[in-house]
Every structure is written in structure tokens, then in C-alpha cells.
Amino acid sequence: ALGRDIMRTVGFDMARGRLDVSLHPFCGGAEDDVRITTRYEKGDFLNALMGVVHESGHALYEQGLPRAWHSQPVGAARGMSLHESQSLLMEMQVCRSAEFMAWAAPVIAAALGGDAQAPEWSADTLHRQVTRVRPGFIRVDADEITYPAHILVRYEMETALINGRMALRDLPGAFNDRIHDLLGLRVAEDRLGCLQDIHWPSGSWGYFPTYTLGAMIAAQLREAAQKACPTLMEDIARGDFSTLLTWLRAHVHHRASSASMRDIVRDATGAPPGPDAYLRHLRHRYCGE
């Protein structure tokens, strides 16, 4: 119930989609039947909730594509970097913010039978939990600071394999060495290392960089939306996502594939995709700058 309530709040049309459970969160389906999933872990409800808002970002993009173009190539989403920007904007930029947690904390406490006045259910506690930085083995569970290291390792590994610089049999050792170099962790078994993702066995080679590109674009879009709509985060703090969704519909979703990703981002933000807004976001959230 909590996940579906949050989906409705961010703008998901429940008449055109649904939420289910899977081992790995994903978004799929068709234009008027957009289905998302999340996974549940005992002792960590926030992980499941962040999975819901992440996949809801993907789903909102799909539900926002122009109906008149549904049967045409121009009506498709404009590539996975932009798609990941929509999920990461919703999850990282918005739903891990202090403003969102100010609204969500009492909603979460009520849904899970907690005392909204108790410190463990406070907005500050929940915000600290979802922005905690701690290196770990699993990419999908990584925090916002260490996540790019997981992507860098995978990018280095797949380019070395494709270019013939590394044999497949050497992948586990090379993968583990780079995880230790970047995160200081010793991988004990391959299921925590090079075998944890579905991308390579499913043929999605070269996909991993779209997550970092998406994170950069998400920060750039959120910054532009904030500039255009100064009350944006105040609205979020009241549980009102209409300002954000209206802006995204006009500047991203309704564009579909009518222009390149680069042009869509430039038109929406005034600049081509770049790292500046992303770095400002990280410094502000984690360094207080």
C-alpha cells in the first residue's frame, strides 16, 4: 500500500499500470500498461521504497509519451541515458531530498505502524538513512557517492573484453582487484562481484555508462526545473509533484524521439549534457557547499 501511495503521489497513473514484486526492480510493459516491480528485504523498507520511486521515474516517462505518436518510431523514448535520467531524477534528486522526506516521514510512519513523533521515524533520520555513504559490494544498493565507482569498474572490464585486452577467464580477478582499488573491499565470491548484474549475460554490453550519464542529466534537468519553477522543492515538501511533472512533460516526455538526447537536454536546460550540475548537486548534498 505504501509503495502504491507513493506512486500515485509522484504522478503514476494506476489506471495505466501496476506494481508487482520481482528479484530485481524493473519497468516494462506498453504505453497504457506500464508495469514496475520492486524487491523487499527484511529490515530495510527504504530500499524497496527507493526501488519504487526509481522505477516510477521510468514509468512516468513512458506514460508521458505523446499518445498520437504511440505507433510511430518518433513516439518512443529517446534512448536509455535520458530514460535513466528520469528514474534518477525522481529517486536521487527528489525522493532522497530533505524536502521529500519532510512530507514522506509521517506517511511512512503511519503506513508501517510507527510513531511519527519518535526520533527513528523523523524526517531527519530517514533523510540521513537514504543519503548515507558506505562502500558496498552490490551496485544496485550503492550510495550516490560510491555508485560511479561501480560503473567505472564495469566499463573498464567490458571495454577490455571487447577490445581483446583481457581474456574472459581473467574477468573475476580483474574485477575484484579494481573493486579493491576504488572501494577498498575484498570480493569473496563472484556473486558479489562480476556475476551480480544481468546486463552482460543478457547482452546489454555498453549499458552501464547510461547510469552515470543519466545521473548527470538528472541533476541538470532538476536544476533547470528549479530555476523555471522556484517553488518546486517547496511543493515537493507538501507532497505536490504536479509542478515537477508538468515541467518534465513539456520539456522531456512530450519530446519523445523528435530530437536527439543532446538537443532535448540543451533545449530544456540551456546547455548540452555535462557534469557541472551533477557535481554541484553532490557538493551541496554531501559537503554542504
Model-derived regions: residue spans:
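C-terminal, non-catalytic "cap/extension" segments appended to globular domains
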Residues: I151, Y155-E289
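Contiguous, non-catalytic segments that form substrate-binding/exosite surfaces or channel walls
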Residues: A1-F45, L279, Y286
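Short helix/strand-bridging catalytic loops that position acidic/His residues to coordinate divalent metals
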Residues: T37-K42, A68-G79
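Post-HExxH zinc-binding segment in Zn-dependent metallohydrolases
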Residues: A76-A118
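All-alpha helical catalytic cores of prenyl diphosphate-utilizing isoprenoid enzymes
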Residues: A1, I6-D20, G114-V153, L185
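Acidic/polar loop patches that form or flank catalytic/metal-binding clefts of enzymes
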Residues: A15-R16, A68-H70, R96-P106, L168-R169
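Active-site metal-coordination segments of metallo-dependent hydrolases
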Residues: P73-E84, T146, W205-Y211
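Active-site recognition of the HExxH zinc-binding catalytic motif
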Residues: N47-R67, E84-L88
